[in-house]
Design a protein with these regions (language model features):
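Juxta-kinase regulatory segment immediately upstream of eukaryotic protein kinase catalytic domains
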Residues: 1-30
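ATP-binding glycine-rich phosphate-binding loop
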Residues: 25-47
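Active-site Asp-x-Gly
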Residues: 64-66, 73, 219-221, 232-273
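Active-site activation/catalytic loop segments of kinase-like enzymes and analogous catalytic loops
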Residues: 79, 252-283, 292-311
Length: 330
């Protein structure tokens, strides 16, 4: 099946019932677009008794069809959900996997309900509620604390093809002097500002070294893209979705990415400090800082832009801080 909103209700019902994912007495009322999917095609099936979320990967990035992407990524995401949901402490944060069609690269998830992600915190003076921020840290802390046996780690996909694609946008593309992306179309003056970092050979060397670590294996199960777009608030509860970039790697990666987004969203410094304090554990704070710096740089001068409400001067201050975190923590 090729997933789209144009599929008839009867065809969708037949497909889901043939797979035993809907009961014979259930009906499909309509199909909806649940949100803006970057990587995959996502459809909400609204039924008379319950709703389902269908998610299908294609051989390209859904938002940028010109960018090839490994079609197997949906299977990796499914394995993350299966592994993480086996842990009672994490189950409450995640959607349940209803079914998986390997041939169609399609996964069916329970619909957590109509909510909103946390990208609203990028707007001016929109602090994240204390209980939600605490839940975001708790999920990461519990996930990273899990100790899996060597057989489980070996059997889990390395997700290397998707990581290599991501590596390009994290560690390479933002630092290319002529990558075809005019940052002045995002904000006048940003292109000239970015050139400071695109031409900094010492910084680029440190970033390249970080990229090698990103592509290496580790022993901690990571979400892989832990930022406000992967967090949902549904029925006053914090949820986590979209772990398609997951892999076993260094815990510092997820934490550094999270801190970077809180900083770009201009969350209070005291809240950022609370995140580190609550997470606790034995982590390499210098490495966390480097990942934080990398994520800030790639989001401001790279392709994957955010809805930041920052002046050019505020972005300049963030870029300076990010570069310092990368070079001084090496």
């Amino acid at each position: 099946m090729e997933l789209s909103l144009d599929i008839s209700r009867s065809a969708m019902l037949q497909y889901l019932q043939d797979k035993n994912w809907m009961e014979p007495y259930e009906e499909v009322l309509r199909l909806e677009k649940p949100g803006e999917g970057n990587m995959n095609v996502v459809v909400r099936v609204v039924g008379d008794t319950r709703n389902l979320i269908l998610k299908q990967s294609r051989a390209f990035v859904n938002k940028y069809p010109q960018i090839p992407a490994p079609i197997e990524r949906i299977g990796v995401e499914r394995q993350f959900y299966t592994l993480a949901a086996s842990l009672p402490e994490l189950r409450k944060y995640l959607p349940w996997v209803v079914g998986f069609d390997a041939k169609s690269h399609l996964m069916v998830l329970e619909d957590l309900g109509k909510g909103a992600d946390y990208t609203f915190i990028y707007k001016k003076e929109q602090p994240m509620a204390a209980e939600d921020l605490s839940a975001a840290v708790e999920f990461l802390k519990v996930l990273h604390a899990q100790k899996f046996d060597s057989e489980t780690v070996r059997a889990f996909p390395d997700n290397l093809a998707l990581r290599k694609l991501n590596h390009e946008h994290l560690f390479v593309y933002p630092y290319m002097e002529n990558n075809g992306f005019d940052l002045d179309t995002i904000q006048p003056g940003l292109q000239a500002l970015a050139m400071t970092y695109k031409t900094d050979s010492a910084l680029k060397q440190k970033v390249s070294a970080l990229g090698e670590v990103y592509l290496s294996a580790g022993g901690t199960l990571l979400h892989g893209d832990y930022y406000p777009g992967s967090w949902l608030r549904v029925n006053a509860r914090f949820k986590v979705i979209d772990p398609e970039f997951c892999f076993f790697g260094p815990a510092e990666y997820d934490l550094g990415v999270m801190l970077a987004h809180l900083r770009m969203a201009q969350q209070p410094e005291a809240d950022i400090e609370k995140v580190v304090e609550q997470y606790g554990g034995e982590i390499n704070s210098g490495f966390v800082g480097q990942i934080e710096g990398m994520e800030i740089l790639r989001r401001i001068i790279g392709l994957a832009q955010l809805p930041l409400e920052l002046t050019l001067e505020e972005k300049e201050a963030l870029l300076k801080l990010a570069a310092k975190k990368i070079t001084s923590n090496a």
